[in-house]
A protein has these predicted regions:
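Residue-level detector of anion-binding/catalytic polar loops
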Residues: 47, 75
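C-terminal domain-tail junction helix/linker
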Residues: 70-72, 96-150
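Histidine-centered active-site/metal-ligand motif
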Residues: 7, 76, 130
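Mobile-element integrase/transposase regions
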Residues: 1-10, 16, 32, 150
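Short small-residue beta-strand/loop micro-motif enriched in glycine and branched aliphatics
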Residues: 16-20, 77-79
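Active-site beta-loop-alpha junctions of metal-dependent nucleic acid enzymes
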Residues: 2-3, 20-44
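RNase H-like two-metal-ion nuclease catalytic core shared by retroviral integrases
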Residues: 53-57, 62-69, 76-99, 111-119, ...
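Buried hydrophobic side chains on well-structured beta-strands
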Residues: 15, 51-53
């Protein structure tokens, strides 16, 4: 089966999440992901001001990734080494993603699991209640969404 690299972006205010499963964690791949995440969030009227990442090479040393951050007009921040809780919202989302999507059931293939991601992510963003959001889904914190999109 090989490995899948799950790339995640979570909005700090709303907890709205964007996820892609990609073949690697190279700088150019991560930069492409960030650009697409920026377009996703822009579609909801969310401007990316800061990008917080861990200290992996693809984030810290990649010119492509730094260029993508600059294109968004954002500032890049790094977590303190060996302190993933610094990026707690994304780390908590990763746990939810693993428990409720990736390992929630047995898939026949990685492709089947990846194919199930859009529906799961829609449910997460639009319907899943969050304790930190008073039992409301992330989309409820996004004020620029037409009612038909909820």
């Amino acid at each position: 089966m090989g490995y899948d690299y799950v790339h995640v972006a979570v909005d700090d205010h709303s907890r709205l999440a964007y996820v892609e499963v990609l073949p690697d964690e190279r700088g150019a791949t991560c930069a492409g992901f960030l650009r697409r995440a920026g377009a996703f969030f822009a579609g909801y009227g969310i401007t990316i001001e800061r990008v917080m990442t861990d200290n992996a090479w693809c984030y810290r040393r990649s010119r492509d990734f730094r260029a993508a951050v600059a294109e968004l007009g954002a500032v890049q921040r790094f977590i303190k080494p060996h302190c993933p809780w610094t990026n707690g919202k994304a780390e908590r989302f990763n746990q939810t993603l693993a428990y409720e999507w990736a390992y929630a059931r047995v898939f026949d293939s990685s492709a089947q699991r990846v194919d199930s991601l859009p529906a799961w992510l829609h449910g997460y963003n639009h319907h899943r209640p969050h304790t930190a959001l008073a039992g409301k889904p992330p989309i409820s914190r996004v004020t620029n969404v037409p009612r038909f999109d909820i």
